């Protein structure tokens, strides 16, 4: 019998991404229920959530739900879904108030019932367990007012000891292998568990504390016990001086739900109603850290935190009853500017087609419902030409271009509505026809896609039919026949203009009016945006052809698209720059930073918290204060130009679901080729007749999961790399006997 030896080699295609402070996970993302009670991270890196419906596993992209089965009956009531722990050996445990203990069986990818309280204990008592806990000795505690049921997960033996405390246990913190702090509904106790006997150790300072304890946290380095209560604030027991202190945390009117380490010197305190607080373990300085901001669309979205998990710079929160909220401390936040229904002190419409900053630093937004002006000094909004403005006579409210033609005078180019002139000082808008500057009959434009002011002070207007140069001060106008379908206009130098159109790129001589068509190495010639860097390179954002960089001196192009770089869209809508250190590109599903010196791309998508991610053509500006603002179909976003992402990122590739003849096989099962889990298998040996099989590949990544692509090859069978794909299911049918790598 010949044996088949397989090795799989995978290549990883990815892009670094900008993320945002908060990310929200709900049922629409795959979470089984918005009511989340506990969060853990498993040894492989999966995040595990205990919800009202059961247990969910999350890899950054996909959720998988697990059923808890007892004698072929699913136990999914709230009484069976209470605590989730990871043991010292990395095993995942679930404990319910009904007294059932489930262990995660990694080999078979399921939860297995390993112990439950005797029927006589459960009968007549819907919640026989007041608290479930697993200690560092891998002993599961099922705490009852009359007895403690201790299940040894190593020997699988159960021991029942009398509960000498005589109170309902609410929390346990382990000090060392034999000593514990035990919180109850009336106080805190110091106890020793030795030879299966629980003895209370008298402690005057603790025994005199009379309060309902919700949460205990023992800071081993400082030997301090932090005691979270129900509406009585936060207390501290210092084992070094044997004293109890009431801490001035200002949490007397809320319930403290969880206390965990944040770093070596700080702890985080979660509450049911006041968000998360941060406290220094030495000075006891306590400040609000994560608190709901209901005035922002992209900030913390709730204050009832049932549990949280500190995962490096990322904090996962069970935000009851909303779902999971993830805060990432690596990244700066951004401002999301949106329309608020019925509120005139907001953006007039969320479809933002153009943005400019005027000479006074105020912001103008062209939308599908008129123009919005935001005063940066007074923080006030004012709208023009919208359906909300009284006395407005225009029937068309869609505007797609803006330009400050002289201080305080704004031109707004419309869609089938010509140009309107807004006098900022007088707060008046009126229809304006630049053709009145000329004696010739100039055909009205269907739309005005681009209006800009060149270095000589001339105004350029580009529309469906015409390209016009307008001397606003002298009231002269000049047309350039032969150029139409204008999409963007920028100045090359004092003598030339770059003209982007629906049919390609042109270089125009201002004086002579002659223009040169620039042949581009792409099939789709529609240009969305142009930007010229200080070194003369022209960046061209196209529709469905990616990014072109044109070197005019050498008459050469550099072409970037989805198939040859980490760009995740070939539709480049807006191009802005931070003094050429980086080039910012907006697309229909991301923002992308391109770094010319390194020729690398970094993407920022909805997965990383970018709430508004479908951007509009030529809609953006770099402000004088160093902030970028970009317009989208869902408002505008503003962030500082220096906001960057770390270049160190983590992912873990997972091999799973080995199927032979279309049936999943597990280690140790009869006929299975696996001795250990497929993810831990180095050499896969198959019998000659096991030549129809498949294998699934996935990754654990919480920053950019949708940007991961997989490619594979099997030397000796398929020597070339497969086409990169987002999902990777490798199938083999009738593979010939032999050795493959």
Where are the regions a protein language model picked out?
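Residue-level "micro-hotspots" composed of small/polar
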Residues: 19-41, 47, 69-82, 120-125, ...
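Loop/turn residues immediately N-terminal
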Residues: 53-56, 98-101, 146-149, 185-189, ...
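Asp-box/WD-like beta-propeller blade repeats and closely related beta-sheet repeat scaffolds
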Residues: 111-131, 445
